[in-house]
Design a protein with these regions (language model features):
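Polynucleotide-recognition surfaces of large bacterial nucleic-acid defense/processing enzymes
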Residues: 1-148
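Basic, amphipathic alpha-helical recognition segments used for DNA target recognition
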Residues: 142-146, 154-162, 167-221
Length: 222
């Protein structure tokens, strides 16, 4: 793909197929130097969506849906009225606004609901989780017994950072705006490594060149 402008950027079809698969998405590179760097980075390793023998083979999933599963959610006010064994049955539900780089509790819920819900930033990274909703662990359709890597899929290519990835502790569940990573084998080093790489400047640059307002699974796969 070429332009007639002298300052235009050209891409080869083999590169576009490797960069975005069947979608043939065109990266938003501002100069030939950026395009050359993009092509070099995309040619070094297999795409994340490719199955590789003895690789980590990452896949992504949404654990619960904030709309479809809302009848199973317990508001924080109702959760605080429960005591002892009743309260122990519930796990916190993570929403997208709670997740930032290396921090799954960036914001805490204060009051309200829907668009009028009030949240505030936690004073320090790793502060106690204060969600808006809880859910009975027995009603969650996935295993919550281990740490998982996650990311916030509501983001933007013009934000200070596009990729916001963190580690979710066991016995917590993620809403649909916080997809989680699964690997072929259970090894705590894999989600830790994925979070570190996802939050790097290199991966952030690669991702922001291919998305607008939602970070979808196919962006990662390609």
């Amino acid at each position: 793909l070429r332009t007639d402008r002298q300052d235009g950027v050209s891409y080869s079809m083999p590169f576009l197929r490797r960069y975005s698969g069947d979608f043939l998405t065109i990266p938003e590179c501002k100069s030939p130097a950026e395009a050359a760097l993009m092509e070099r980075l995309c040619g070094v390793f297999p795409r994340l969506g490719e199955r590789v023998e003895d690789g980590w083979n990452v896949s992504f999933l949404r654990e619960v849906d904030m709309t479809g599963d809302k009848e199973q959610f317990l508001p924080r006010e109702a959760f605080l009225r429960k005591r002892g064994a009743q309260r122990a049955q519930y796990v916190p539900v993570f929403e997208g606004r709670m997740v930032h780089q290396y921090d799954c509790s960036r914001k805490r819920y204060r009051s309200g609901s829907g668009r009028t819900a009030k949240w505030e930033r936690n004073p320090r990274p790793g502060a106690p989780v204060t969600p808006q909703f809880y859910m009975k662990e027995s009603q969650v359709p996935v295993d919550l017994s281990h740490f998982r890597a996650c990311f916030c899929d509501v983001t933007g290519q013009h934000n200070v950072r596009t990729v916001l990835a963190a580690l979710i502790p066991p016995h917590c569940v993620c809403g649909n705006k916080v997809p989680v990573c699964r690997f072929d084998r259970e090894d705590i080093r894999l989600p830790l490594l994925w979070v570190a790489l996802a939050n790097s400047f290199v991966v952030d640059w690669l991702i922001r060149k291919r998305m607008t307002t939602t970070l979808n699974f196919f962006h990662w796969a390609n």
